[in-house]
């Protein structure tokens, strides 16, 4: 119940009250969301640190007096996301890349205030990389030389298999119905004048994170790609 309560009040930063209420009810009443809340609670934590980062971005735009402090907290929150679990690291890198890319397009990345964002991110993400270097299992892909890595990613059978599995799973089952229904509600209820830049960053984040997930799936054993995607991808979709 606390998750549902936090979800509603978090969405109110971006949506009109009715849209936030309806979307909270739809998401929180889905069987898959309830299963993740109980069995895969780390997924909920990952999702909330990402959501918290977007909320802090909105606050930093509205409160110029605390803008530097809030941007530091944005970077810290994004970096902490990577510590929770492997998916969090993907989201963490995707979101910081989205913010940097957006600011590069606006020619505002060299602004001094962005240093606070980067510093906060580095403080939180460096321990994650140290942990992964010493305490995670070796990755088969990382053990390949440069030529083997190129051949690995140019394996069109593998690329087609991953793309087909992701595309098929995305448009089957109950999850995709919930996803597109929520997306429609968000578009209708989004506070465009207030958070239009945040919407652009989120679109970049969605593109980058999906691309990184695709690259991760490319590293999976070829004979078990479909089974792995079927097991993991729905969690990322609901996140």
What are these regions, as identified by a protein language model?
Residues 12-19, 63-69, 104-118, 187-207:
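Membrane-interface helix-loop-helix junctions at transmembrane boundaries of multi-pass membrane enzymes
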Residues 7-29:
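Transmembrane-helix signature of polytopic, membrane-embedded enzymes
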Residues 3-14, 47-61, 76, 93-101, ...:
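Transmembrane alpha-helical segments
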Residues 38-45:
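Short acidic/glycine- and proline-prone juxtamembrane loop motifs at membrane-interface regions
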Residues 23, 53, 57, 70-86, ...:
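Membrane-interface alpha helices of multi-pass inner-membrane proteins
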Residues 31-38, 80-82, 128-132, 206-231:
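Transmembrane-helix signature of polytopic, lipid-linked glycan biosynthesis machinery
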Residues 101-102, 113-190, 206-214:
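Membrane-lumen/periplasm interface segments of specific transmembrane helices
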Residues 21-28, 73, 194-224:
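Transmembrane alpha-helix segments characteristic
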């Amino acid at each position: 119940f606390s998750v549902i309560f936090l979800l509603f009040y978090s969405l109110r930063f971006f949506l009109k009250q009715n849209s936030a209420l309806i979307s909270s009810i739809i998401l929180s009443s889905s069987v898959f969301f309830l299963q993740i809340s109980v069995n895969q609670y780390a997924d909920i934590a990952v999702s909330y640190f990402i959501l918290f980062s977007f909320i802090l971005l909105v606050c930093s735009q509205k409160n110029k007096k605390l803008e530097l402090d809030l941007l530091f907290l944005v970077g810290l929150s994004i970096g902490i996301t990577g510590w929770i679990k492997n998916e969090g690291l993907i989201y963490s890198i995707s979101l910081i890349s989205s913010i940097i890319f957006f600011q590069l397009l606006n020619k505002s990345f060299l602004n001094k205030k962005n240093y606070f964002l980067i510093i906060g991110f580095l403080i939180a993400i460096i321990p994650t990389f140290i942990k992964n270097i010493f305490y995670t299992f070796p990755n088969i892909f990382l053990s390949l030389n440069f030529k083997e890595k190129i051949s690995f990613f140019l394996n069109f059978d593998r690329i087609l298999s991953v793309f087909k599995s992701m595309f098929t799973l995305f448009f089957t089952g109950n999850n995709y119905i919930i996803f597109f229904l929520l997306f429609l509600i968000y578009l209708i209820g989004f506070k465009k004048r207030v958070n239009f830049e945040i919407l652009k960053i989120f679109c970049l984040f969605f593109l980058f994170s999906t691309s990184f997930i695709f690259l991760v799936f490319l590293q999976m054993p070829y004979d078990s790609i479909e089974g792995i995607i079927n097991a993991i991808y729905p969690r990322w979709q609901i996140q």
